[in-house]
């Protein structure tokens, strides 16, 4: 399944608030479609599927990428669900977003893809790059790059920078000081249901 490029508010009406995908809120509380206002009871599978879809659309990853993160999380010690969240949160595109350099994760991904972002002094144009403690994230020393990010910072996607990051606004320099803690994940999600969804599939 490819990365979604359709109407974002249609997705938030179906899945709820997705802070990484869009800053806008859906006007209607019920899902889109002819039968969106129905109250039909959902199956356990449908509930687990919805939680999985929240991850995919919020972080902008394909099904294949998400399966890779699930498999990687299973090979580590500790909570598989929390590890999946940490892997997604520590992606470069998400880190740029959480530092306030872009209003959404798709916007941050575009900055990375176009070579505006440096990690430890080198251009990294891979959005899925896994940031590590000690990484220093800066803006390429070009007038266009700096103006883009300064404009983005006028309208940040989220108000608070998580505790594992620090950011110096005058120099547009961010630093990764650790791995994100669960309480700082902005997406409202039950990651255990995601693990259950993939228990027989990934």
From Swiss-Prot:
Annotated InterPro entries: Ribosomal_uS4, Ribosomal_uS4_bac-type, Ribosomal_uS4_CS, Ribosomal_uS4_N, S4_RNA-bd, S4_RNA-bd_sf
Domain of life assignment: Bacteria
GO CC annotation: small ribosomal subunit
Entry keyword annotation includes Ribonucleoprotein: yes
Any one GO molecular function term: rRNA binding
CDD domains: S4
Protein's GO biological process: ribosomal small subunit biogenesis; translation
Domain spans labelled S4 RNA-binding: 90-152
SMART domains: Ribosomal_S4, S4
The entry's keywords: Ribonucleoprotein, Ribosomal protein, RNA-binding, rRNA-binding
Ranges for region Disordered: 18-44
Entry annotated with the keyword rRNA processing: no
Pfam family, one: Ribosomal_S4
Entries under Gene3D superfamilies matching the protein: Ribosomal Protein S4 Delta 41, Chain A, domain 1 (1.10.1050.10), RNA-binding S4 domain (3.10.290.10)
Protein family according to the UniProt entry: Belongs to the universal ribosomal protein uS4 family.
Subunit structure, as described in the record: Part of the 30S ribosomal subunit. Contacts protein S5. The interaction surface between S4 and S5 is involved in control of translational fidelity.
General function of this protein: One of the primary rRNA binding proteins, it binds directly to 16S rRNA where it nucleates assembly of the body of the 30S subunit. With S5 and S12 plays an important role in translational accuracy.
Protein name in the entry: Small ribosomal subunit protein uS4
